[in-house]
From Swiss-Prot:
Keywords: Cytoplasm, Glycosyltransferase, Nucleus, Repeat, TPR repeat, Transferase. Its EC number is 2.4.1.255. The keyword DNA repair does not apply. This is UDP-N-acetylglucosamine--peptide N-acetylglucosaminyltransferase. It catalyses: L-seryl-[protein] + UDP-N-acetyl-alpha-D-glucosamine = 3-O-(N-acetyl-beta-D-glucosaminyl)-L-seryl-[protein] + UDP + H(+); L-threonyl-[protein] + UDP-N-acetyl-alpha-D-glucosamine = 3-O-(N-acetyl-beta-D-glucosaminyl)-L-threonyl-[protein] + UDP + H(+).
Length: 1151
């Protein structure tokens, strides 16, 4: 069982920075026009800018850019000074050095210069103007303005002073005065480009973008070499959404001076935001070529590599940036972020701690550091660090959201829910909190609330990959598999490396039956994240289902190495070992598995052991019920949301049968085809008394084209293919419309089940029967059809259903119809030999021609058998025909693989091993063979002189204690062997190894391959005794072996699955084959193996009881079942509550 779909708790990296501005390295342009362009693609129109500006993280980037520029003006000027040497700089270069915000004109040469008195000293206007510029460049705006005012008072038309006053007032936020000085400058010289550029800054700051653009454009028109104006124009164009023109403006600036590495870096930022990563990369590389010590370009180039998935190159460039500038805070943050994504957690912690050394009260860095602690499993440390981030920045929704994630991981779900709500209180559009709160609601079973929250998260942020994946998981749970696939694909489109989405989509594809596509998804998830334990576990499960045990064990083991505390992987790995009988550390493994299940049930989690596997482990009845109940709840939850607001299904009228209608019974199964369940019950629909019941069969699987399916379709009054109605709600509506009185669940939790249909209650009475050997644990199932031996009242606490007893056994087999050619047999022997009657056998549907041969002799044995439904004990005479002919030619035929031969002149026989090749439908049991089939021990390498003990069950039903009993039996029965099946083949080496370790000669264990149905049953005649598996009996295989007349030894335990064989044997009238203890089990088998007369008598008794008892009597079974179903309806009809129906049947003493 693969783990139920993983719900991504989106642990957002708080305030993750992208491209970084160079502190102090930006050429003159307005501080409020950051060099970062909004995220988007090339050619984004202005109409789409609003959406682009909402890109997660964009606002943080812009604010960081602005804050960096404002806080580092002095450093900016220093960096520019390093780029352009003041001594010998060109006029254009001198212009770039004047101010980070405003453009100033060069002083106009005047002769002679007027003077002003400064600090009692007479100075020229030129000297005072220079002093004003120096103070401005140092950020000393008050002193700069004082000097400018002295000049202005003396010369109101001094153009450089007017421009400088405009710049000073812009920096000090006196925007109106800044605008007035710019207008005065234009009045003085209407061709002054700098004045128009500064006026553009004013309009941009006031939000009048069009006016700003007009002034910037006029500035560059007046002065085409005006770099400052081009940069300001580029920033304004970005704000207006005209990204292509902004790129052009940057290019124009760089054509004037290609060595402006800061401008080139800003152009790279814009190109990156437009999705033009390769062009951005060229810009950053050119900036680094121009100035190799330019740390910002190294950091920005790291951002590009990170966006392209080149994680190691990104790490290298961020590390280079912090090497060049050890105080580069943003580079440390980016380095920490990319190391976190690469899951290099220790180095990520170091990077974040270095950032905190530079800025100890940086809430964002505390938040990111907490995320790493969370990923490392240091939950308490993560919680403390998130709380520190919140203390530093109380209005921090991301931190509240991530704190909630950590609290939830710790098990503090209530507190986690409160933190998500706090995040949403601070920011109602916080999509992460919507998503994560939905996860909690989903785990609480509040599917409707969860769905609403996921949809809300996607409404806020349609590109939210985790929310798409989580919504898909709910859709999968509801059976809307195609819709789920669409959302998983959308999640992967948004986040191509979203490993969880790939893994979950694999689960959905597996459920849809597309195993190859599911494997591809799991492998892709592992390729993305080799440490993704869930994906390894899911891949293991699909290998397990396909019987690829080596691959399954390897993948489960890998999952556990990656995640030692992984209950699903541990329990599934334990089941794999059980399947192949690998019992190393068996007791320890089983104890741990039981503890895992008990812990999960205590915490009200879905257990990691599937209901159908729970019978294999020493779990309490309460635990098995709880496991089943959890799965029943999943079925109920899946359909509950679908039916909200719909009219409840209308049941058949309570008095419809009383008013003359026949009782309508509906059999529901996915196994109407070539499946053991159909092999058992295919004749029942046709043998029901149609004067009493009206039979409906509802198939959950498509037509497999076999005769089994055809027989059921033809002999049922109504056969409905529900596989063509995939919607459980509509399927339930169909059943309700058919007016079914009693609906019978034949699947339980086996493959192909649709218990969701039963959860919708389409019938007033719903019953478990035959196909699933345990309780459903479901409140929507009323009865389980069983018997007093299989389910004595003392074990009623093992079921949520009420017990409804059949009078003999609840089990049935169609062998008398399906395999009637095995009703009789002829033993073939050489004259004068004492070969056993189980060495060489002939079977055919018509024995008369063989029995007429003169070579036929008769062996007669008297025995006592039960007869009929009243189980009357009667004497019976077994007459066994023996054909005495030379057997050597037959043995040669078998050794050479010859298909047919003449035993006598007119008697052609067929090698029984050739049935599959010669008659396919006869081999599968769909048709009765029309030839004489020869079955020999030689065909299976079984010695003629040996006592052959057999077991044809799947090997997972064997446990160490069972094999220990079998070894003891072999040790006490000379010349005995144990005949098992390679079911699966991987179990053979482990069983042989176990036996050898306990001193048993490995040659005494014989394995055969799994065979088609007819051969599988027929070859059972070659065994002397069948040894049943107490842990989980042979159910269908028990019926198979008994049909061949072979005695079966069993021992009932406490589970239903462990008591079926006992019920069969009691119904057959041979309770002496049922042991109460392990010692008795061994004793019964040893006596059969060592006492030839006792064995012969027991074989005769079983052989005769097949046809005299009710065990294989389908007609009688139908009559008994009709009585029982009628009693259920009578109780309902009279308004009586559901209760046990025992019909005073008593459980035999000691059972």
């Amino acid at each position: 069982m693969e783990k139920p779909n993983y719900f991504q708790s989106y642990n957002k990296v708080i305030g993750a920075t992208g491209e970084q501005l160079a502190p102090g390295a930006v050429p003159p342009h307005p501080v409020l026009a950051p060099s970062i362009a909004p995220g988007g693609v090339a050619g984004v129109s202005a109409a789409n800018m609003a959406n682009i500006m909402q890109t997660p993280g964009f606002a943080n980037l812009v604010q960081q850019a602005i804050r960096t520029q404002l806080e580092n003006q002095a450093a900016q000027q220093l960096a520019v000074n390093q780029q352009f040497q003041l001594n010998g700089a060109t006029a254009v270069q001198q212009q770039l050095l004047l101010t980070p915000q405003q453009s100033l004109a060069q002083p106009i040469a005047l002769a002679p210069q007027p003077t002003v008195v400064l600090n009692g000293v007479s100075e020229t206007l030129k000297k005072v103007t220079e002093l004003a510029h120096r103070q401005f460049q140092s950020g000393n705006y008050v002193e700069a303005e004082k000097y400018c005012n002295l000049v202005f008072q003396s010369d109101p038309n001094n153009l450089p002073t007017l421009l400088l006053l405009s710049a000073i007032n812009f920096q000090t936020k006196n925007l109106e005065k800044s605008m007035q000085y710019s207008m005065l400058a234009i009045k003085v010289n209407n061709q002054c480009a700098e004045a128009y550029s500064n006026l553009g800054n004013y309009y941009k700051e006031k939000g009048q973008l069009q006016d700003a653009l007009e002034n910037y454009k006029l500035a560059v028109k007046l002065k085409p070499e005006f770099i400052d104006a081009y940069i300001n124009l580029a920033a304004a164009l970005v704000s207006g959404g005209d990204l292509e023109q902004a790129v052009t403006a940057y290019f124009n600036a760089l054509q004037i001076n290609p060595d402006l590495y800061c401008v080139r870096s800003d152009l790279g930022n814009l190109l990156k935001a437009m999705g033009r990563l390769e062009e951005a990369k060229v810009c950053y590389l050119k900036a680094i070529e121009t100035q190799p010590q330019f740390a910002v370009a190294w950091s920005n180039l790291g951002c590009v590599f990170n966006s392209q998935g080149e994680i190691w190159l990104a790490i290298h460039h961020f590390e280079k940036a912090v090497t060049l500038d050890p105080n580069f805070l943003d580079a440390y943050i980016n380095l920490g972020n990319v190391l976190k994504e690469a899951r290099i957690f220790d180095r990520a912690v170091s990077a974040y701690l270095r950032a905190l050394n530079l800025s100890g009260n940086h809430a964002v860095v505390h938040g990111n550091l907490a995320c790493v602690y969370y990923e490392q499993g240091l939950i308490d440390l993560a919680i403390d660090t998130y709380k520190k981030a919140i203390d530093l920045q109380p209005h921090f929704p991301d931190a509240y959201c991530n704190l909630a994630n950590a609290l939830k991981e710790k098990g503090s779900v209530v507190e986690a829910e409160q933190m998500y709500m706090k995040a949403l209180e601070l920011c109602p559009t916080h999509a992460d909190s919507q998503n994560n709160l939905a996860n909690i609601k989903r785990e609480q079973g509040k599917i409707e609330d969860a769905t609403r929250l996921y949809l809300k998260a996607l409404e806020i942020y349609p590109e939210f990959a985790a929310a798409h994946s989580n919504l898909a998981s709910i859709l999968q749970q509801q059976g809307k598999l195609n819709d789920a696939i669409l959302h998983y694909k959308e999640a992967i489109r948004i986040a191509p490396t979203f490993a969880d989405a790939y893994s979950n989509m694999g689960n959905t594809l597996k459920e849809m039956g597309d195993s190859s596509a599911a494997i591809a998804c799991y492998n892709r998830a592992i390729q993305i994240n080799p440490a993704f334990a869930d994906a390894h576990s899911n891949l293991a499960s699909i290998h397990k289902d396909a019987g690829n045990m080596a691959e399954a064990i390897q993948s489960y083991s890998t999952a556990l190495k990656l995640k030692p505390d992984f209950p699903d992987a541990y329990c599934n790995l334990a089941h794999c070992h059980q399947i192949i009988c690998d019992w190393n550390d068996y007791d320890k493994r089983v104890r741990k598995l039981v503890q895992i299940v008990e812990d999960q049930l205590c915490k009200k989690r879905l257990p990691s052991v599937h209901p159908h596997h729970s019978m294999l482990y020493p779990l309490s009845h309460a635990a098995r019920i709880a496991i089943a109940a959890k799965h029943a709840s999943l079925c109920f939850d899946k359909v509950h949301v679908q039916m909200l607001g719909k009219t409840p299904l209308i049941h058949a009228d309570r008095f419809s049968v009383q008013n003359g209608q026949r009782l309508r019974i509906g059999y529901v199964s996915s196994d109407f085809g070539n499946h053991p369940t159909s092999h058992l019950m295919q004749s029942i629909p046709g043998m029901h008394d149609r004067s009493r019941v009206e039979v409906f069969c509802y198939a959950l699987s498509v037509n497999d084209g076999t005769n089994f399916r055809s027989k059921l379709m033809n002999e049922s009054e109504h056969f409905v293919d529900l596989s063509q109605i995939p919607c459980n709600g509509k399927a339930a509506e169909k059943i309700a419309q058919d007016g079914i009185h009693i609906l019978i669940n034949m699947n339980g939790y086996t493959k192909g089940a649709r218990n969701e249909i039963f959860a919708l209650r389409p019938a007033p009475i719903q019953v478990m029967w035959l196909g699933y050997p345990s309780t459903s644990g479901a409140t929507f199932m009323d009865y389980i059809i069983t018997d007093a031996v299989t389910s004595p009242l003392r074990l009623a606490n093992a079921f949520t259903e009420k017990l409804a007893y059949m009078p003999h056994t609840f089990f049935i087999g169609d062998h008398a119809q399906m395999l009637r050619h095995l009703t009789d047999k002829v033993v073939v022997k050489d004259k004068e030999t004492t070969e056993r009657d189980s060495c060489l056998i002939m079977n055919t549907a018509n024995m008369d021609p063989i029995l007429a041969k003169s070579e036929i002799k008769e062996q007669v044995l008297d025995t006592e058998v039960v007869s009929g439904p009243n189980k009357e004990l009667v004497r019976a005479e077994m007459v066994l025909p023996v054909l005495e002919v030379p057997t050597e030619p037959i043995k040669q035929m078998i050794m050479t693989g010859q298909m047919t031969m003449n035993v006598m002149e007119d008697m052609n026989v067929q090698n029984g091993l050739g049935q599959s090749q010669m008659h396919h439908k006869a081999a599968t049991g769909e048709e009765i063979p029309n030839s004489v089939l020869l079955t020999s021990r030689a065909q299976y390498q079984l010695p003629d002189d040996a006592i052959v003990f057999c077991n044809f069950n799947q090997l997972y039903k064997i446990d160490p204690s069972t094999l220990d009993m079998w070894i003891k039996i072999l040790e006490n029965v000379p010349k005995s062997i144990l005949w098992l099946l390679r079911f699966p083949y991987q179990g053979e080496e482990h069983i042989r190894k176990y036996c050898v370790e306990r001193g048993l000669d490995p040659s005494r264990i014989v394995f055969s391959n799994v065979a088609a149905k007819e051969e599988h049953v027929r070859r059972g005649q070659l065994a002397d005794v069948c040894l049943d598996t107490p842990l989980c009996n042979g159910h269908t295989t028990g019926m198979d072996i008994l049909w061949t007349g072979t005695p079966m030894v069993t021992m009932p335990l406490e589970s239903l699955a462990s008591r079926v064989a006992t019920s069969q044997l009691y119904a057959l009238g041979v309770p002496e084959l049922v042991a109460k203890t392990r010692q008795e089990y061994v004793s019964i088998a040893v006596r059969l193996g060592t006492d030839a007369d006792h064995l012969a008598n027991m074989r005769a008794k079983v052989w005769m009881a097949r046809t005299s008892s009710t065990l294989f009597d389908v007609k009688q079974y139908c009559h008994d079942m009709e009585d029982l179903l009628g009693q259920m309806w009578k109780r309902y009809e009279s308004g009586m509550p559901i209760d046990h129906i025992t019909n005073n049947t008593e459980t035999p003493h000691g059972l």
